[in-house]
């Protein structure tokens, strides 16, 4: 339902990724005057998969893209956790129809590009401004001015920094702080499903856990592609870029001795990309006056729960609700947004970090106890265990 404001609250969003675009779509539908400013000269998303649980898919459905998600995504039937060497399934957690029945929305695996395009399509083109690299903010009390490298400047009632882990908006609010290298490097690849028919893969998310490493694979793009993520521990990341072109042979060497299915998926890739995984400690606050942060700009998390994008989507929906509640008091709205979202996102940051420890246990007594605990059901590692989401 749109608000009939005497003065339509204007909002500038810095960053045209999934979080920024979702925020724009939510706020535009609520009647706000929204513009997105993206530093890239064209909108695109890297070729990688993404998990969208029901906590996020229900929000995306309300934006009118349910049909696109069902057509381009995959609804996996389970989440399987396996041993690295023999492929033994330690735990199979149901997804699919069971999750949708329980939570009222589906669990999707998607190509990031498919989701990104779906969001771009629901935002009027005149609301997306490319080649705008944010450089400075000036808060005048009753409005905020954003300045850009190309010489442009814009004024708005509120400024949302959705510009990722290296957020310039965050830097402007809270000063410089380098993200921490976590000691993990991830190799990502996309493989045509046609190359893997001999493996008999099903629509199930698979995570293989091993000493100091783990390997994840699942279908995307209506089942035509298989996305894989291979994570291993490295002592340092010396390159300035946080993402580089990788080499398939390097991934094969890193996962030497792993199950044949893992190696077959890696071998089928034409190329891989290598990400250094960085994080930051949870912030004590996200907002200052008329400016706040969203997504990785304020709560970057390791991709070990599949909740990074989902939490940015939740941020977007909560931001819309808070601004709708206080449309004429932006400062109060952003303060409420922070109070509602910060504890939840910080909790998930910690849970993602803990999963790194659980996934990467060396073979030994602790690993045997973990496996026995999973097999016995003494600890619930299923999606239902995080129904609080």
Residue ranges and their predicted role:
Residues 181-183, 200-204, 248, 260-276:
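A short coil-to-beta-strand element that immediately follows conserved catalytic motifs
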Residues 71-72, 127, 256-274, 330-335:
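Acidic/histidine metal-binding catalytic segments
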Residues 370-389:
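Tryptophan-rich aromatic "cage" segments
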Residues 12-41, 160-161, 187, 217, ...:
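Conserved mid-domain beta->alpha element of the FAD-binding
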Residues 10, 33, 225-228:
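Residues at the starts of beta-strands that form the adenosine-phosphate
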């Amino acid at each position: 339902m749109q608000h009939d404001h005497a003065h339509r609250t204007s909002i500038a969003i810095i960053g045209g990724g999934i979080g920024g675009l979702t925020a724009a779509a939510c706020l535009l539908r609520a009647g706000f005057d929204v513009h997105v400013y993206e530093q890239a000269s064209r909108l695109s998303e890297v070729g990688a998969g993404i998990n969208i649980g029901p906590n996020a898919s229900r929000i995306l459905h309300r934006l009118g893209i349910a049909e696109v998600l069902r057509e381009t995504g995959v609804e996996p039937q389970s989440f399987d956790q396996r041993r690295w060497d023999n492929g033994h399934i330690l735990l199979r957690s149901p997804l699919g129809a069971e999750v949708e029945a329980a939570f009222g929305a589906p669990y999707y695996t998607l190509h990031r590009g498919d989701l990104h395009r779906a969001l771009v399509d629901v935002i009027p083109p005149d609301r997306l401004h490319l080649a705008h690299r944010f450089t400075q903010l000036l808060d005048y009390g009753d409005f905020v001015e954003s300045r850009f490298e190309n010489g442009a400047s814009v004024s708005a009632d509120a400024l949302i920094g959705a510009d990722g882990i290296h957020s310039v908006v965050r830097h402007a609010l809270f000063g410089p702080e380098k993200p921490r290298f976590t000691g993990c490097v991830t190799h990502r690849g996309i493989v045509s499903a046609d190359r893997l028919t001999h493996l008999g893969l099903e629509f199930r998310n698979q995570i293989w856990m091993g000493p100091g490493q783990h390997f994840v694979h699942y279908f995307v793009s209506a089942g035509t592609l298989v996305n894989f993520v291979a994570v291993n521990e490295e002592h340092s990341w010396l390159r300035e870029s946080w993402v580089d072109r990788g080499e398939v042979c390097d991934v094969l060497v890193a996962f030497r001795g792993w199950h044949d299915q893992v190696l077959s998926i890696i071998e089928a890739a034409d190329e891989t990309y290598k990400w250094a995984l960085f994080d930051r400690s949870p912030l004590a606050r996200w907002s200052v006056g008329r400016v706040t942060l969203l997504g990785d700009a304020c709560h970057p998390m390791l991709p070990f729960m599949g909740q990074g994008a989902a939490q940015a989507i939740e941020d977007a929906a909560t931001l819309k609700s808070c601004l709708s509640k206080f449309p004429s008091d932006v400062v109060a709205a952003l303060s409420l947004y922070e109070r509602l979202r910060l504890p939840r996102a910080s909790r998930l940051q910690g849970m993602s970090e803990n999963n790194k420890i659980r996934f990467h246990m060396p073979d030994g007594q602790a690993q045997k106890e973990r496996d026995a605990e999973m097999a016995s059901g003494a600890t619930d590692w299923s999606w239902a265990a995080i129904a609080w989401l």
